[in-house]
Amino acid sequence: MWFLILFLALSLGGIDAAPPVQSQVDCENSQPWHVAVYRFNKYQCGGVLLDRNWVLTAAHCYNDKYQVWLGKNNFLEDEPSDQHRLVSKAIPHPDFNMSLLNEHTPQPEDDYSNDLMLLRLSKPADITDVVKPITLPTEEPKLGSTCLASGWGSTTPIKFKYPDDLQCVNLKLLPNEDCDKAHEMKVTDAMLCAGEMDGGSYTCEHDSGGPLICDGILQGITSWGPEPCGEPTEPSVYTKLIKFSSWIRETMANNP
């Protein structure tokens, strides 16, 4: 079984991923670009602030009523750093197969390439110590890099448990062949493979759309992985952003 790191079971939703308790690293206020994407008042996915007006997330996180929270660490507390924004425009990548989202049961031939989407905020974000954009990559990530994934996804692989605070986990950037061997679904050159081959470090349910930062550089966003999460020899898959830098920049420029 596979899951998009949100819930493919949702009619308008996606897939999600989360880090395990034993592999967490301190995350509070260290990821000022991390964004919480909601459908109505329910948390759905992570996202990444690219500039004051734009958030990047996964295309499988598409929904019909977005709300975005920036500067947030704890879901249960009203924090002084919180910024709430609506979304004026959602632009999934034109080559992402949106038909995969409508109560679709994942199949071995499914191709989740191009799993990214831009959200234009209805009001620009205020840049503060805990709300800051991150730049797009300008070069390929290096295999073996230490990567950091973050999110509010499940910290347990089967009976999902969700943290109050933003969680981070260190993962290793692996050859795509490792994911291709581990999974039946297609792994393409528009994807990255990251995890720990002995398990225990992973993204999971509701981490979708969150950042994958390798050697300090944004290189991916969480896309899909195995179910249950964190299985040994079954790393997760991330959208490879260097492949989409031109589309992202052009789309932002053409939608001022």
UniProtKB/Swiss-Prot annotation:
User: Which residues, if any, are the signal sequence?
Assistant: 1-17
Give the GO biological process terms.
positive regulation of phosphatidylinositol 3-kinase/protein kinase B signal transduction; proteolysis; small GTPase-mediated signal transduction
Question: Residues annotated as region Activation peptide homolog?
Answer: 18-24
| Disulfides per UniProt | 45-61, 147-214, 179-193, 204-229
Short name of one Pfam family? Trypsin
Q: Is Metal-binding set as a keyword in this record?
A: yes
Could you tell me the keywords of this UniProt record? Disulfide bond, Growth factor, Metal-binding, Serine protease homolog, Signal, Zinc
* Cofactor(s) this protein cannot do without: Zn(2+)
Report the co-factor binding details: Binds 2 Zn(2+) ions per 7S complex. The Zn(2+) ions are bound at the alpha-gamma interfaces.
Q: Which family does it belong to?
A: Belongs to the peptidase S1 family. Kallikrein subfamily.
Q: Which PANTHER family match?
A: KALLIKREIN-1, KALLIKREIN-RELATED
Name of this chain's protein: Kallikrein 1-related peptidase-like b4
From what organism does this protein derive?
Mus musculus (Mouse)
Give the encoding gene's name.
Klk1b4
